[in-house]
Amino acid sequence: MKIDVSRLSAAVNDAHARHAQAPGGANASYIPYLAKVPSHLAGVAAVTVDGDQVVAGDADYAFAIESISKVCSLVQALEDHGPDAVREKIGADPTGLPFNSVMALALHDGKPLSPLVNAGAIATVSFLKAANAEERWKKILAMQSALAGADIALSDEVNQSEQTTNFHNRAIAWLLYSASTMYSDPMEACEVYTRQCSTLFTARHLATMAATLAAKGRNPLTGKQVLKPEHVPSVLAEMMMEGLYERSGDWAYMVGLPGKSGVGGGIMAVVPGVMGLAAFSPPLDPAGNSVRGQLMVADVARTLGLNLFDRA
């Protein structure tokens, strides 16, 4: 399936025009940095597997990646250990509960189930092949940059805001440790996980990351093979099951694309073999997904007939 660039451009611009001022939602308030991001911002981007780029609105505004970073640490874990080990040690099942749920751990004897919820992501960071925190962090940051096709940087302001409010995640890390599902020092893993959520991305960067996954692990802008092609299906399966937390089922039902959201207002979706889509707008629904971002990405997907469950 190949999409004409002029048709893609029309779909992206129309989606932005229709939904950039959609009502509803509110900025994440529990992280001080996120609470003060201008809520009117809205951008959408598409990057094809051939490297074509189409953007509209605030697609180049830099925002905190937050939970979308979980995809990057999952990719690194797959590269370090392979899909079987990741499935055994972390899991490959949706929790059906909020992304920071402690109950999910209690219900499953301390196993985090999915690398795309907080418990699983912290465990994933601990599972990476690394001798210490800095080595762990450098691998994750390098992976973020390779997937985005850009020099991704840590925001000290976001990191400070997160590190001083991550009490819940610290508790999760100790619960994992008590259940023997933590594979490094728990506070080291939690600190590095918090850092990985504090880097700055744009919607264009997210669309490039999604396009890299759409292109079987090859970044269409840099030409670099970022991850092994055989690891991509594992990433997309996790995104389809848990990428939008307890709204993942609704997203699959309505949009039919593997996606991942973050409380910074970003969202991305992968159209295998075709393109990556992404959007950014800070106001969130109760599950922590961008209200306008979902609308914009869903609009483009619907206009172009991209639903994976509705393709001949």
Swiss-Prot record:
GO terms for biological process: glutamate biosynthetic process; glutamine catabolic process. NCBIfam families: Gln_ase, PRK12356.1. The keyword Hydrolase applies. This is Glutaminase. Keywords: Hydrolase. It comes from Bordetella avium (strain 197N). Substrate binds at residues 67, 118, 162, 169, 193, 245, 263. It is an enzyme of class 3 (hydrolase). It catalyses: L-glutamine + H2O = L-glutamate + NH4(+). Its EC number is 3.5.1.2. It comes from the Bacteria. GO terms for molecular function: glutaminase activity. Pfam families: Glutaminase (PF04960). Belongs to the glutaminase family. The keyword Hydrolase applies. Homotetramer.
